Amino acid sequence: MTSVRRHAARGLVALAAAVAVSAPLAAPAVAAPAAPTAPAAAQSVTGKPVARPEVVGHRGASGYRPEHTLAAYELAAAQGADVIEPDLVSTKDGVLVVRHENLIDGTTDVAQRPEFADRKTTKVVDGVALTGWFTEDFTLAELKTLRAKERLPQVRPESASYDGRYQVPTFEEVLELRERLSARYGREIGVIPEIKHPTYFDSIGLSMEERVVELLDEHGLNKRNAPATVQSFELANLRDLNENLGLKAETVFLSSVNGAPYDSVAAGDTVRDYDFYETAAGMREVRAAGVDTLGPAFAQIITKEKDGSMGEETAFVSLAHRAGLEVVPYTFRAENQFLYTEFRSSVDPNAQGDMVGMIQPFLDAGIDGFFTDHPDLGVQAVDTWMQGKKEHPGRGVGKTAQRGLKVR
């Protein structure tokens, strides 16, 4: 996922980000901070410049605003995110809209809308029975009457104070916003759409891949090294995009600490689960499908012990880089309940701990970027690490190389 690094250097620092966070938003727009002088590049032990790991605003700045709203994306850019992440699902009339899943009662006010009460239903999505309201049962015009709300109001009450202000955006609106934000801040801001539940949507006649390619084409982003990358938890649709549907932008294959891609499940393939794709053979298969980057859960890189503390570094990054794949893990969140125990600030699960400190060993392990709900803290983490690289050029070669772990 090198597209943004190839286009522009960062134009923000943590101080400007902190100002952006503290300022309330009466409207989705976020005032542009003054562009500071870019920090000097760090160097490796060989004296070569070290690429700056990319910060991806996960669902926007979703630690501060309701996720997947234009306001969340604007704030992510203001805080210094290199890339913003819209998750894509389809409407009944085939429009790509931005939600983390097609089940929308957790992130919109649809359950409080009596005119849509009869749309509540139960469906099986990726083998799981779900009850609620689904995007594919609404036209775009109907979805636009809804308003977004915070997914975790008890954890993020400040974000919940913005409930009811923002619409559900379309993917096209996010692409248009990306262009405006890039012009506003004088740097290319990347976009990394995730195609959600591709096997399911294909099964109901609402395949999204073709429209993704069309929109990237229309916005000049369907080319190598463009500030755009397409991601999926399934490999089959990424292969189809690369081999048959004309996608030229880079791709990311996402994985998890357990389970299997649903395309494998649907095909009855009991071999190609997410564990398989952590092996050298699995990664070579991913690369052969034309994929550029792996997006694992961060616990696939440094494990989590049973007591919640940080465990051992795995061979994941080393194997991926050997296969020609970059590594961009998800999702770093600042609240204690999402951190390894040694980085928690207190027993309060909703208080913020030391996310900046927790990210450091992952950067040392050699990751190429990361997803975070708190882009301002993500930028601070990278700034801290880059300064450490300048002062200690040998830092961050990855423990896997030092330990000589065997390749599976």
Q: Across the structure, where does each feature detected by a protein language model lie?
A:
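Phosphate-group recognition and catalysis centered on beta-loop-alpha active-site segments
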Residues: 2-14, 22-408
